[in-house]
Amino acid sequence: MVRISFIGDISLNDNYIKLRNQGINPFESLRHILFSSDFVVGNLECMVKGNQGVNEKKRPRLETKIETLNYLKNINLSLAGLANNHIYDHLEDGFYRTTNFLKENKIAFIGASLKNDEYKNPAYFEKDGIKVVILNYVSLDTNPYPPKEINIRVNYFKEEKVIEDIKRLRNKVDHIILYLHWGGRLEGGLYPDFEQPKIGRRLIDAGADLIIGHHSHTVQPFEIYKGKYIFYSLGNFCF
């Protein structure tokens, strides 16, 4: 059996920076859950501030500090999803500093890359002969607002392409999980928009085994369709 813990949106700014400076670990009570999981997956929405300025097209912007990113080790994060609407907030230098920290601390990331096509690559987990793949996408309705001439490459959600990815992987792994930053038309809403259930069911029909959604910053309902779970939004983990 493979145990994967999915947590919601992560933004280690403001109060988390203060707590880190005070030497406080606000996640200690979750340690027994997160450190007993084989893998922990979260949507990382805060980039480290860089030297190139900020994405003036985007409001609000999220940011953190390198020191505060150390909290990711306190939650045993295995994989950071970067396909989200805050990935451009601190331009290329902020992206580089953030992903360099992840690499140095052996935290994998998917959904975005700098100047190359690695943003398209899924993440693979395997334990006891069970193979799991996770694919990460962001929908345009979440308003990422990419700056002009930016070299950050992001895995945007296009249903036809996602279905192609599912079918390409279907016979190579045991479980396909879609990790979706979506539902921008109802950000802050308690329910998915009218299109999301239709899309989610089509993706299950195409061969996905589980859909994990985020972006709304609220916990939204889930459904079981043909025996497969669709979680429309996990809400915030720390924000």
Feature names for model-found ranges:
Residues M1-F239:
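Acidic, metal/ion-coordinating pockets
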